[in-house]
Amino acid sequence: MSGAADGTVPVGEDTHQEDSGERECEQRPVHSGREATGESDPALERPDHGERHGPEPRFPSFSVRPEAAQPPPSRTIARESFLGRFITDCLKWKNDVVKIDPNICKDPFPSDDEIFGNIGSHSTLLRELHECAYRYQKAVNASHPLLQRDGSLKTLNYGVQPFIVTVYGPTGSGKSQFLRNVISSKMIDPPPETVFFVTPEKGTVTNEEKLSWEAQCAEGVYNSKCVPITKTFQPAFVNLSFSEAVDEENLSIDSPNNVFVQAAKKGPICIIIDECMNQLGACRSISSFFHALPSKIFGRFPACTGYTVLVVLHNMNPRSDRGNIKDLKIQSKCHIISPQLESQQVSRFIKNFSFGFPTPLVSVIKDIVDHAKMHSKFSWLVYCSVPVRESFRWSYYSPEDQLTPLYVDLQAVMYEACHNIRRVFCKRLYSRVSYANKRKWYD
C-alpha cells in the first residue's frame, strides 16, 4: 500500500505489463500485402479524419456483355458457287474420260459428297482449285466471242497470213471434196478471188470436176443472203501442172510472167496442190515455194490480203524425199489428218505435237480419231500450230458438226484439278488407314 501511495509500481506488476505488451506484439499479424489480409483483420487504411469514403470499386474479371459463340468454320463448298460449278464440271469430265482410259484418274478417287463436304478444310487445295477455275473461265471467255452460234469455228486461220496447210489422207478419204468444202464454206479468211489448182498433169482435171470446183468457189464468195463478200462475183479458177507451178519464172517474184504475182495484184489467192506427192519427193529443191515466195508476195502487194497454200499428201512419211516435204511440214501452220490414215502414223503425229498438255490426254485424242474412223468416214483431225486462241489448237471437222474445237487446254486444266483433288484426299485416306492400323497394333 505504501508503494502504491508513493506512486511506484511494484516489481511484479511491472513485469506483468511488459509481458502483456510483448504478447500483444507477438499476436499482431504482419501483413505483406493487400491480398494477405483476412476478413477479421483490421483494414490497412489511412487514418480517418472525419471524412467517410466508400469502398474502392472492384471490376469483375469477366466481360459485362459476353460475346456470342462463333460457329466453327464451314468445311463445305456450295455446288452453286463459282468454285462449286467448276468442281462439278471437273468431276463430270473425269467420269467420262475414265471410260476411255482408267489411268487418267486412277482409283481410289473420293466421292462427290466427300469432296464437297471436306474440301473447305484444305486451304492449299482451295487455292489451287481457285487458280484452275480462274484460268478455265479466262480461256472460255477469250474463246467464246470467236465462235459461231452453234459452237463451231468460223475459219481455219482467223486472218493468219500467209497460211500454208498440209492435208494427209489415203485415196478415197474425200480429200478433194474436203478442199472444195473449205473454199465454199468460207473456212479461209479472207476468201480467195483466184484459185490455182495444181495437178501432176494439166489435162487430168475432167470437165465435171472443173465445174464442181468453179461452182463451189463461186459459193464461197457470197454470204447467206447472196451478197458478195469479195470484189469479184466469180472467182478465177486456173489449172496448172506441177512443172508449170514450180517453174523458175513462177518462183521469182521479180519475173513479169509470174502467174501468182499477176493474180496477187488483183486480190487474195489460194494455191491447191493435189496428187503431187511423187513430184514433190522427186523434183529439185523448191523450198522457196513454201516460205520465201508467200511472204514476199503477201508483203509486197497490198491487194493480196490473203495467201493460202493447200498441199495434199497420201502419206505422212514418204520413202523418197529430197527435202521438199520436210520443208513443207516445217512451214505448215495447219495439219489436217484423215482418220482413215494408218493408225501408227496418226498416233506418232499426236505424240510429237502433244507438247503443252499432259501426256494422259493423248488417249482422249486417239479415242476421237478411232471413233471417227468407225462412224464418220469423211471426218478430219485438225492441228493448228499458230492458233488465235489456245483452245483452237486441236479441232475436229465433220460434215454434220463442221469445225469444232476440242478444247484440249481446258481439259488439261480439268486434269490438273482432278489430280490435285486425288492427291490431297488420297493422302488423307492413307493417314486414316495408317492411324487405324497403328491403333489395332497397340490394342
Swiss-Prot record:
GO terms of molecular function: ATP binding; DNA binding
GO cellular component: host cell nucleolus; host cell nucleoplasm; virion component
Keyword Signal among record annotations: no
The keyword ATP-binding belongs to this UniProt entry's keyword annotation: yes
Subcellular location: Virion; Host nucleus, Host nucleoplasm; Host nucleus, Host nucleolus
Name assigned to this protein: Packaging protein 1
Species, as recorded: Snake adenovirus serotype 1
Highest taxon of source: Viruses
Stretches that traverse the bilayer: none
